[in-house]
Amino acid sequence: YTQEDYDHPNQTVTFLDNHDVTRFGYTQRSQKVYNAALAVLLTSRGIPTIYYGTEQYVIPSDASDVAGRVYMPTECGFSTTTTAYQLIATLSTLRRSNDAIAYGTTTVRYSDDNVMVFERQFYDDVVVVAVNRQPDSASVIPAIQTNLPTGQYSDYLDGSLFGTATTVQNNLIPSFTISGGGVCVWQYQASEAPSTPQIGDVISTTGRPGNTVHIYGDGFSGNISVYFGTTAATVQSTTANK
């Protein structure tokens, strides 16, 4: 809905909370909704920022930003087994491996008062995320269009947020029921490296002659030439994705 509001949406820094605002755990006490919000943050466009303690469901004593700056060893402890911690780890891995999340376009495939299904796509890489923000009521989602290829897709989160598998045929996800607070993540990655470079992001977007520019994407192995307009740039180094 806000694509036209940003020149470079994939470079925006996104967050649920930080040191200048109220802790998300203070305003949202339902862990189902909390986890669903984390899933959306980590699969949406932009650069997600995770405030320390978010993975521990920190709830401060009041709504001030100061109260949110807890001293972890004595005020909340640290566990690597919380659902939030595991969710952040799992979806961070997906962000690194599937370029649809880092660079892809966003298409809202379905939305109502409680549920949103959105699709991220970068060339042949596709990720579909279905989220029910209502923690207590399941919703039935009608069949929806998708760019996922025909095939069976397990929930990338292995059901940790009550997600289920799906089977795609002819670019259609069949009707499904999503549990209260549920999140489904289905993903597809192209099996072969691209034959031509696929540019995902360019940083920085402004500069002057002599500045170093970083180009991210896929298919950059081998001899690569870079031009800005008709001016050839000196390529200092390349990897498959940078």
PLM segments and residue spans:
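Alpha-amylase-like alpha-glycosidases and glucanotransferases acting on alpha-linked glucans and related
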Residues: 1-47, 56, 63, 101-103, ...
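Conserved, mostly hydrophobic/aromatic
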Residues: 19, 41, 53-55, 91, ...
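C-terminal accessory region downstream of the catalytic core in glycan-modifying enzymes
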Residues: 72-77, 84, 88-93, 143-171, ...
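Short proline/glycine-enriched turn/loop motifs at strand-loop junctions of beta-rich domains
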Residues: 136, 146-151, 218-224
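C-terminal beta-strand-rich structural cap/linker in extracellular carbohydrate-active enzymes
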Residues: 166-196
